[in-house]
């Protein structure tokens, strides 16, 4: 391989202070060269020491640093490297096996020694040397070039990792936290968490909810039932006569209804909801068993398909000022406007690319294959006296979902709210907003069409006065307050510990407090 030999070396930055030292080989005619291959460890590169004839013709051992070499007459130069290797013992064992390479260097000031392998012994500077010597190249007895395999002892990966960690720990700088610094940090943390937790709990008091439960059954499938119920301060989380704020949010709450069930969650086709029309039932097989419907003795593809879309929430809410006194039909009450626009229901949510209605001309071209059950126009047969079942259902949806204000068909705000599956069995869907402040009591006119009695479900109307944070903050406030109290206890413990040491005439300097022995006596 040539006249140069390399060996991997890693040292610390302190080793750069060694300049030059003369090296005398023990034999007058060393082999041509020694090649040592060192693999990089942990992604680091290796430095090398090369053996080459010196400028003066002697057998010097110049050092090579990251590709740049400096040759001096019978001298050496040493530099630091950045890769990891094995321990000192393994390299010394290999040196003893090749005496022709062993040289003795002159001591530098009586503190450091340098030998022919490039090993520097420093009492304060730890070194890591590469550990692989796969081959040796030199001249045999006949004078021909010869290469010999050199046995190498590989250390376990875990042992090398631990060795490197020890080397890093021995030369790293670690902060030693004093008791005063930790005490101040804990005190600041306690003040922060206690104050923020108290503020969150106070804000939660400004969050008021008034909940009206109703779960009346409908008379029969597809029919409606009308209710008029009052909402007073007795239905609220705390005693209030007025719900404050610029707007009061109205939510429809469902109980014991699991939208995240696999049979419901995956029963949908997102491409169809985005405006794609499918005429082949095989294209919407994920919606089964609600992928097709028989309309006029013809099997058609449902648009939109799926169990969740077919079971859209259809109860309707209206609000009136005051409460009824006597017969509902004879007591006039002023209605309260309920905002159900898409801007309110779908505030700051990019729904336009996910929910689209197909163009009217595209729907008209495939009416014989696709059943657009949410469209009153596509189900109108042109006869005013008798309406088909499909036409009646579409017109009922148009009224219950408020197509005029909340959008039509798939782009309806109530429908999009319903299609966002909830993670728990009890959930709320935003229904609209009322202008605030709202004086209590108020009346809720409910058109009941969604029957939940078959699975023992629950329904409720919830009026919400939001806090400045927008929702409930009781849990996070309690969590902050608890952690702040824990830090406060730690502060008092450190103060007591510091006071105890001072009474005993000792000085506490760091956190490594030692347990007092039983025989220790307190100083007076």
UniProtKB/Swiss-Prot annotation:
Q: Where are the transmembrane segments?
A: 182-202, 474-494
Renumbered residue ranges of the record's region Disordered = 1-40, 52-86
Which stretches does UniProt call biased (Polar residues)?
1-19, 26-39
The membrane-topology field of this record reads: Multi-pass membrane protein
Residues in the Extracellular compartment per record? 203-473
A Gene Ontology biological process noted in the UniProt record is: protein localization to plasma membrane
Where in the cell is the protein located?
Membrane
Organism superkingdom: Eukaryota
What residues bear carbohydrate chains?
297, 339
Q: What happens when the gene is disrupted?
A: Conditional knockout in tachyzoites severely impairs lytic parasite growth in host cells without affecting intracellular replication. Loss of egress from host cells; however, tachyzoite motility and host cell invasion are normal. Guanylate cyclase GC is unstable and, together with UGO, remains trapped along the secretory pathway. Loss of microneme secretion in response to phosphatidic acid or a decrease in vacuolar pH.
Question: How does this chain assemble?
Answer: Interacts with GC; the interaction regulates guanylate cyclase GC trafficking and sensing environmental changes.
Quote the protein name from its UniProt record. Answer: CDC50-related protein CDC50.1
């Amino acid at each position: 391989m040539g006249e140069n030999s390399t060996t991997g070396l890693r040292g610390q930055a302190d080793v750069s202070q060694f300049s030059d030292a003369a090296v005398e080989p023990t034999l007058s005619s060393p082999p041509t060269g020694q090649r040592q291959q060192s693999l990089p460890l942990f992604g680091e590169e290796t430095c090398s020491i090369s053996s080459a004839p010196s400028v003066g013709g002697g057998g010097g051992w110049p050092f090579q640093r990251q590709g740049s070499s400096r040759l001096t007459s019978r001298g050496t130069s040493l530099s630091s490297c950045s890769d990891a290797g094995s321990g000192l013992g393994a390299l010394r064992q290999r040196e003893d096996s090749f005496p022709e390479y062993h040289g003795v260097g002159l001591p530098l000031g009586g503190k450091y020694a340098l030998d022919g392998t490039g090993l520097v012994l420093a009492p304060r500077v730890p070194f890591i040397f590469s550990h692989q010597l796969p081959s040796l190249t030199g001249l045999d007895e006949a004078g021909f070039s010869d290469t010999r395999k050199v046995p190498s002892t590989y250390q376990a990966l875990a042992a090398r990792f631990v060795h490197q960690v020890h080397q890093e720990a021995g030369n790293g700088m670690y902060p030693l936290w004093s008791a005063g610094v930790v005490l101040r940090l804990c005190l600041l943390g306690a003040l922060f968490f206690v104050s923020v937790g108290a503020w969150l709990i106070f804000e939660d008091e400004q969050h008021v909810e008034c909940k009206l439960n109703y779960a009346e059954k409908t008379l029969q499938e597809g029919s409606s039932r009308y209710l008029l119920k009052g909402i007073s301060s007795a239905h609220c989380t705390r005693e209030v006569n007025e719900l404050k704020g610029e707007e009061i949010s109205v939510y429809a709450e469902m109980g014991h209804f699991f939208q995240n069930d696999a049979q419901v969650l995956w029963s949908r086709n997102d491409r169809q909801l985005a405006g794609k029309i499918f005429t082949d039932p095989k294209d919407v097989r994920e919606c089964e068993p609600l992928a097709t419907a028989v309309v006029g003795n013809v099997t058609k593809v449902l648009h939109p398909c799926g169990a969740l879309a077919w079971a859209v929430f259809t109860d309707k809410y209206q609000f009136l000022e005051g409460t009824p006194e006597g017969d509902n039909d004879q007591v006039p009450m002023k209605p309260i406007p309920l905002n159900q626009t898409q801007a309110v229901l779908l505030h700051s949510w990019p729904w336009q690319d996910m929910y689209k209605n197909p163009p009217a001309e595209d729907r008209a071209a495939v009416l014989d294959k696709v059943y657009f059950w949410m469209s009153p126009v596509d189900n109108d047969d042109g006869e005013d006296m008798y309406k088909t079942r499909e036409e009646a259902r579409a017109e009922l949806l148009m009224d219950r979902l408020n197509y005029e204000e909340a959008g039509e068909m798939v782009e309806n705000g109530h429908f999009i709210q319903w299609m966002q599956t909830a993670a728990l069995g009890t959930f709320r869907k935003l229904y609209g907003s009322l202008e605030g402040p709202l004086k209590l009591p108020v009346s809720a006119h409910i058109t009941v069409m969604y029957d939940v009695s078959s699975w023992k479900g629950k329904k409720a109307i919830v009026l919400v006065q939001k806090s400045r944070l927008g929702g409930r903050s009781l849990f996070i406030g309690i969590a902050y307050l608890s952690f702040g109290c824990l830090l406060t206890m730690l502060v008092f413990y450190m103060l007591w510990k510091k006071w105890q040491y001072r009474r005993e005439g000792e000085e506490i300097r760091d956190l490594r407090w030692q347990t007092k022995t039983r025989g220790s006596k307190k100083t007076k």
